[in-house]
Amino acid sequence: MAKLHDYYKDEAVSQLMKQFGYHSVMQVPRVEKITLNMGVGEAIADKKLLDNAAADLTAISGQKPLITKARKSVAGFKIRQGYPIGCKVTLRGERMWEFFDRLISIAVPRIRDFRGLSAKSFDGRGNYSMGVHEQIIFPEIDYDKVDRVRGMDITITTTAKSDDEGRALLTAFNFPFRK
């Protein structure tokens, strides 16, 4: 079992129960899923770019990504409906906890000029979204084999009812928020 999951069950739950005055363990917010999304707009011209992005996402997450397609045609972007324009992975369970641990302890500190993550990126329901400009912050990516530096969106979906609960949950995991 992932060490972050053990930490959540052993320490974070009791800490959050005291902080918010919950009566039951089931009321405590928990991380439900983590979604990684990589938009590859240049895939319109070169399909190989999407394959490389999918390979990067597979290496990072340990799971085969779903190819996302354009929902509608946009002439300005030269996109037609149904064109493959990105890929995404939804992590749950054990893989989610392993990825979350690597994200907090290894990947985020490797971000260039890192001064902490914005605490304003909550959506109003306790879910946190962040953007990463380079996929090379993850140790699974071999720097020499990268054809192009790509960014990705990382969304951490929680069962928290408010942003304060979500922020407290992530802070319990030592999530590096900007002061």
Swiss-Prot record:
One of its GO terms (biological process) is translation. InterPro entries: Ribosomal_uL5 (IPR002132), Ribosomal_uL5_bac-type (IPR020930), Ribosomal_uL5_C (IPR031309), Ribosomal_uL5_CS (IPR020929), Ribosomal_uL5_dom_sf (IPR022803), Ribosomal_uL5_N (IPR031310). It comes from the Bacteria. GO terms for cellular component: ribonucleoprotein complex; ribosome. The keyword DNA-binding does not apply. Keywords: Ribonucleoprotein, Ribosomal protein, RNA-binding, rRNA-binding, tRNA-binding. One of its GO terms (molecular function) is tRNA binding. Pfam families: Ribosomal_L5 (PF00281), Ribosomal_L5_C (PF00673). This is one of the proteins that bind and probably mediate the attachment of the 5S RNA into the large ribosomal subunit, where it forms part of the central protuberance. In the 70S ribosome it contacts protein S13 of the 30S subunit (bridge B1b), connecting the 2 subunits; this bridge is implicated in subunit movement. Contacts the P site tRNA; the 5S rRNA and some of its associated proteins might help stabilize positioning of ribosome-bound tRNAs. Part of the 50S ribosomal subunit; part of the 5S rRNA/L5/L18/L25 subcomplex. Contacts the 5S rRNA and the P site tRNA. Forms a bridge to the 30S subunit in the 70S ribosome. This is Large ribosomal subunit protein uL5.
